Amino acid sequence: MGLSKTIPLVLLPILMFGVLSNAQLTSDFYSTTCPNVTAIARGLIERASRNDVRLTAKVMRLHFHDCFVNGCDGSVLLDAAPADGVEGEKEAFQNAGSLDGFEVIDDIKTALENVCPGVVSCADILAIAAEISVALAGGPSLDVLLGRRDGRTAIRADAVAALPLGPDSLEILTSKFSVHNLDTTDLVALSGAHTFGRVQCGVINNRLHNFSGNSGQSDPSIEPEFLQTLRRQCPQGGDLTARANLDPTSPDSFDNDYFKNLQNNRGVIESDQILFSSTGAPTVSLVNRFAENQNEFFTNFARSMIKMGNVRILTGREGEIRRDCRRVN
């Protein structure tokens, strides 16, 4: 498959706009207007994660699903409000019933509004919360840049089109990333976030029990013993909302075991395993490098997170600073 795609000319104005806007983001954006923003967010995430070991992965996923749909503008947090032109990305089938962690973002926003009202955007709260969550799980320091503003709409159909799916081919995955000026290294590094968290059985049901439309058949790329483990966790005809660990080796730690699992054909989601199973693809060597060297994975993940966090941002007078992350002002 052709993985190094030429970016269509129609996308260049969007990408150029993103580059120009990124220059307005800084690591110390709130140093005078809300200097305790990170400390406040960290305290609330630490407290919430003591009661929910999965929280850090949930928050990381929120940030990813925000940035991949029309940029990092906090739109994923908006509840559906048709009168305000908000369809709600939460209702996209990739998100419905599985996207979580909204409550801790609400708590952070409430706390910040009490000390520095109208200053910190919900989009930035997501970026800060993702940074903290990765660190709490043992991952690298991200040093996120700040200064985003919040969008005023959310479009369900855009979320359906933009977000990766479990059965996506490598070509489709690469295309979905390249739209955001994210390359193959970004694809593999960011996929490494599946080193923690869970997946609903509905996402992998066909891979385990109905692969390529063949009833009773499974994806032949799954290591046989691991297949039986997954089938016990997600039996045919079972609860599709039940969950399986994305990284069965160290499910709640941010490390490079995800890539080692791929090498052993123990990737849980088809679009994860395909990074290693696609013979001759440049993703294979990246999986091998990250499996061998955790520091190299951490370095590339941090770089890719900053890059993703700058996708089609709103700055200056664009958008707004929401008072409530769930609704527009």
Swiss-Prot record:
Binding site for substrate: P164
GO cellular component: extracellular region
Annotated cofactor note: Binds 1 heme b (iron(II)-protoporphyrin IX) group per subunit. Binds 2 calcium ions per subunit.
Cross-referenced SUPFAM superfamilies: Heme-dependent peroxidases
Residues that coordinate or bind heme b: H194
A Pfam family that the UniProt record links to this protein: peroxidase
Domain of life: Eukaryota
Bilayer-crossing regions: none
Cystine connections: C34-C116, C67-C72, C122-C325, C201-C234
Localization in the cell: Secreted
GO biological process: one example: hydrogen peroxide catabolic process
Residues that hold Ca(2+) 1 according to the record: D66, V69, G71, D73, S75
Keywords attached to this entry: Calcium, Disulfide bond, Glycoprotein, Heme, Hydrogen peroxide, Iron, Metal-binding, Oxidoreductase, Peroxidase, Secreted, Signal
Record-linked InterPro entries: Haem_peroxidase, Haem_peroxidase_sf, Peroxidase_pln, Peroxidases_AS, Peroxidases_heam-ligand_BS, Secretory_peroxidase
Glycosites: N36, N210
Active site, UniProt feature: H65
Positions that bind Ca(2+) 2: T195, D247, S250, D255
Catalyses which reaction(s): 2 a phenolic donor + H2O2 = 2 a phenolic radical donor + 2 H2O
Signal sequence extent: 1-23
Main location: secreted
Family: Belongs to the peroxidase family. Classical plant (class III) peroxidase subfamily.
Function summary: Removal of H(2)O(2), oxidation of toxic reductants, biosynthesis and degradation of lignin, suberization, auxin catabolism, response to environmental stresses such as wounding, pathogen attack and oxidative stress. These functions might be dependent on each isozyme/isoform in each plant tissue.
Miscellaneous notes: There are 73 peroxidase genes in A.thaliana.
Name recorded for this polypeptide: Peroxidase 58
Origin species: Arabidopsis thaliana (Mouse-ear cress)
Lineage: Eukaryota, Viridiplantae, Streptophyta, Embryophyta, Tracheophyta
